[in-house]
Regions:
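Glycan-recognition and catalytic cores of secretory/periplasmic carbohydrate-active enzymes
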Residues: 1-235
C-alpha cells in the first residue's frame, strides 16, 4: 500500500510505501484484515493478511535482523515491538503457524544489548513497546526467551526513572520531557510494567507502575478536565 507517512523533521506527510509497523503500516493492516477474516470466516482476507508481512521478510533479507532493529528501533508503534505484536496476534487469529514462527525467530535474535541502548523508553518508540510485544509472543507461543527479554525490558525501565518536580518518579521520553499519556508518557510505560507484573508476579514492576500512575495523576488539571501537553515541540 501507498500511504501518507508523517515526517517530523519536515512537519508534513509524504506519500510513500506503508511502513512495516502497527501504527501506520503493514502490521496494523494485517491485524485489521485478520480480525475481519476471523469475524466473517469467508477466506477472502486470509492470504491478504498473511501477505502484509512479505515486505518485512524482504527487508530482513536485505539488512538482517540487527539492521532491522537499528532501522526501526524497539517500539510498539513503529519498531520491532510492533512487528512482534502484529505477527503474534495475526498468527493467532488466523491460526497461521508461519507467522508465529516468524515472531519467535525475531525474538530469538533480539539482544539485551539493544534494550540497554534504548533511550526512548516509551510505548510507541521504545522499551515499553518492545516489552508489550514480547509479552504477546510469550503468551501466544510459550517462548521462554520472550519472557526473559521482557524482564530485561522491565529492569531497563525501572533503572531509568527519575524524580519529578511533583514528587513521584517517572521517565524522560520524547524530547527529554517527562510526558504523560499512553504513546510517549508515563501511562504507557506504567501499563507495560503492569502487564509484566501480571505475567511474572514480581512486585517491583507493579510498584514502579503505580508510582508512574501517581505522577500522571499529580498533573491532572481538574478545571480543564485534562492533562497538560508537556511536549516541547510538535511531534
Amino acid at each position: 500500500w501507498i500511504a501518507p507517512t508523517y515526517h517530523p523533521d519536515l512537519h508534513r506527510f509524504l506519500l510513500q510505501p506503508a511502513p512495516l509497523g502497527v501504527f501506520s503500516g503493514n502490521a496494523g493492516i494485517a491485524l485489521f484484515l485478520a480480525g475481519l477474516e476471523t469475524v466473517l470466516g469467508t477466506g477472502e482476507f486470509r492470504d491478504l493478511a498473511v501477505g502484509c508481512f512479505a515486505p518485512l521478510r524482504a527487508r530482513v533479507r536485505q539488512v538482517g535482523h540487527d539492521g532491522l532493529v537499528r532501522e526501526l528501533g524497539l517500539g510498539g508503534g513503529t519498531g520491532v515491538g510492533s512487528l512482534l505484536y502484529g505477527l503474534a496476534r495475526t498468527g493467532t487469529l488466523l491460526r497461521e503457524d508461519r507467522l508465529l514462527d516468524q515472531a519467535r525467530d525475531l525474538t530469538m535474535l533480539l539482544t539485551q544489548r539493544s534494550i540497554d541502548a534504548d533511550v526512548h523508553l516509551d510505548a510507541v518508540l521504545g522499551t515499553a513497546g518492545l516489552l508489550l510485544g514480547l509479552l504477546v509472543v510469550h503468551e501466544t507461543t510459550g517462548e521462554a526467551r520472550a519472557l526473559e527479554l521482557a524482564r530485561h525490558c522491565g529492569g531497563h525501565l525501572i533503572g531509568h526513572r527519575i524524580k519529578s518536580e511533583v514528587g513521584p518518579r517517572a521517565w524522560r521520553t520524547l524530547n527529554g520531557s517527562m510526558l504523560t499519556g499512553l504513546s510517549h508518557g508515563a501511562a504507557g510505560i506504567s501499563y507495560a510494567l503492569l502487564r509484566l507484573h501480571q505475567a511474572t508476579g514480581q512486585s517491583e514492576y507493579e510498584q514502579a507502575a503505580l508510582e508512574g500512575i501517581a505522577y500522571e495523576r499529580s498533573l491532572y488539571v481538574a478545571q480543564a478536565k485534562n492533562w497538560p501537553d508537556l511536549r516541547r515541540s510538535p511531534e
